[in-house]
């Protein structure tokens, strides 16, 4: 049985870095995938599907749902470890519902917790525009990504809160503090 943890948060919240560090510290038990990495791997393969995905990502838009869900399900099932962290998902109510549906129809994956790394919009903007990592890191695209993140957020929080699965972590502290707390939560919930 794969134990799934979803790590959500605004662009620039640090969710990817946090999850990467936890997986590195616990490489014998935990594996981390960024939804973006899974999709970018497909893009890098140069496949027709990859080219389709690329056009969505380049414009800061969401990749079609069926593509994302199938990519995620496949990655979890093939994961070399039993505890899987995925960051950057779900990003919409539709994604959340489709993921929920997929999990209901899959016996070998259990969603344990959804961890939200909370940061203010000002902190997120400062971090993203200060890091200039790729072509999407300009103001207009940041604003689009922020809007894409915030619009469905309350519905996503409510959905997972009702299941007792939402855990919020303050993302405006040092990376050590954030990672230590998140790691503790994951280990506790996964029973390791």
Curated annotation (Swiss-Prot):
A GO term for molecular function: ATP binding
Binding site for AMP: 35, 40, 61-63, 88-91, 95, 133, 145
Protein EC: 2.7.4.3
Coiled-coil annotated spans: none
Gene3D superfamilies xrefs: P-loop containing nucleotide triphosphate hydrolases
Keyword vocabulary terms for this entry: ATP-binding, Cytoplasm, Kinase, Nucleotide biosynthesis, Nucleotide-binding, Transferase
Catalysed reaction, written as an equation: AMP + ATP = 2 ADP
Comment text on domains: Consists of three domains, a large central CORE domain and two small peripheral domains, NMPbind and LID, which undergo movements during catalysis. The LID domain closes over the site of phosphoryl transfer upon ATP binding. Assembling and dissambling the active center during each catalytic cycle provides an effective means to prevent ATP hydrolysis.
Entry function: Catalyzes the reversible transfer of the terminal phosphate group between ATP and AMP. Plays an important role in cellular energy homeostasis and in adenine nucleotide metabolism.
Listed name of the protein: Adenylate kinase
Organism: Nautilia profundicola (strain ATCC BAA-1463 / DSM 18972 / AmH)
Lineage start: Bacteria, Pseudomonadati, Campylobacterota, Epsilonproteobacteria, Nautiliales
